[in-house]
Amino acid sequence: MVDEDKKSGTRVFKKTSPNGKITTYLGKRDFIDRGDYVDLIDGMVLIDEEYIKDNRKVTAHLLAAFRYGREDLDVLGLTFRKDLISETFQVYPQTDKSISRPLSRLQERLKRKLGANAFPFWFEVAPKSASSVTLQPAPGDTGKPCGVDYELKTFVAVTDGSSGEKPKKSALSNTVRLAIRKLTYAPFESRPQPMVDVSKYFMMSSGLLHMEVSLDKEMYYHGESISVNVHIQNNSNKTVKKLKIYIIQVADICLFTTASYSCEVARIESNEGFPVGPGGTLSKVFAVCPLLSNNKDKRGLALDGQLKHEDTNLASSTILDSKTSKESLGIVVQYRVKVRAVLGPLNGELFAELPFTLTHSKPPESPERTDRGLPSIEATNGSEPVDIDLIQLHEELEPRYDDDLIFEDFARMRLHGNDSEDQPSPSANLPPSLL
């Protein structure tokens, strides 16, 4: 039945203020950073006729914030939050700029459907800016998790003439909060195949222990197995007993100083073909796949969303740009393959490390971007990933324009056993290690 609904109409997400006076409509909840541009954040706000007659001011506000401390510690004007992006748009009364700007296709359809009291808004986010990242709390932790997240808020301005103040309780009934996500897609680039050679010298041994490690490519998609090619040449008088391969996620917390947190997201140990004695060789390919389903209890793990949501993956690799400072990103995520050749307690280990990129498969081109005739993204490398990417980017786009609009509540699907109440953003609760 779900598939039939998707074929027969275009999904539109909506959320209404507690007093029912304003309703916000969005075509999708996830917006993709494609390297040269970010999907346009465009929607409509339906305003009650009473507010139209009273000429009440309605504003949309986009906020990307990095919460690195608990909200109950916010005292004396000192908050444990850093605002990375903050933009406002006056929805009503309309400005000359908003009146002259052409509507997107979805906005045109919503305007026809909702009537004259629906008004548009737009936000354009700079490419390679901060993306949504949540640091997973420990089991049993309460409150909101630490991380970088985006909030789209539409509200009716207070009438006491104050400005720049936090909305009063009386105004919260006139406010709609939507927790959206900005995700990263890394366009395919012809990059060299990752490879490293390492050697170890031993006392009382004339030869070296040599190990060569390589990956079949530099970029992988969520749910795709990583092929690790290992070649060992033992010219020493020592014996290699076994091999350990790890996938490590490194999250750099970029504040006043940079702190790094490492999480092991996949691991295999192999005794096949071992031991490799003096003069011996071993060549073998190992397949390892990092998945969130195997790491749900690890505190501090960086995710694309929140664990209680069904459509959440491990955080994608951050695409760094020489013109972008790490401090403006909040959290920088990277991945590495680490290989350890174990020789024994007295002889130590020989290890090698290779970085790689973990990202989403290529999403469809944004319809509005295509209409403007802007260049498309390079094709991917053609590799077919395993279908375990839980964030289905193609479902969030506007597929057709001759079908019906299907309105859905904005709240995301939750895993069984989690609270179904939609949580506002930005996130708040911080692992104690960051305090």
From Swiss-Prot:
UniProt keyword Phosphoprotein present: no
Alphabetically sorted, this entry's keywords are: Cell projection, Sensory transduction
Which Gene3D superfamilies does the annotation name?
2.60.40.640, 2.60.40.840
The record's listing under Pfam families reads: Arrestin_C, Arrestin_N
Which stretch carries the motif [DE]-X(1,2)-F-X-X-[FL]-X-X-X-R motif?
A: 404-414
**Composition skew (Basic and acidic residues), residue ranges:** 362-372
Q: Which GO terms describe its biological process?
A: G protein-coupled receptor internalization; positive regulation of growth rate; positive regulation of insulin receptor signaling pathway; signal transduction
Question: Domain note for this entry?
Answer: The [DE]-X(1,2)-F-X-X-[FL]-X-X-X-R motif mediates the interaction with the AP-2 complex subunit apb-1. The C-terminus (aa 369-435) is required for the recovery of chemotaxis from odorant-induced adaptation but is dispensable for behavioral adaptation to chemoattractant isoamyl alcohol.
Please give the function described in this protein's UniProt entry: Adapter protein required for olfactory adaptation and recovery to volatile odorants, probably by desensitization of G-protein coupled receptors (GPCR). May play a role in clathrin-mediated GPCR endocytosis. Acts as a positive regulator of insulin-like daf-2 signaling pathway probably by forming a complex with mpz-1 and phosphatase daf-18 likely resulting in daf-18 inhibition. Involved in egg-laying.
Please identify the protein, giving its name as recorded: Beta-arrestin arr-1
Say which species the protein is native to.
Answer: Caenorhabditis elegans
Gene responsible for this protein: arr-1
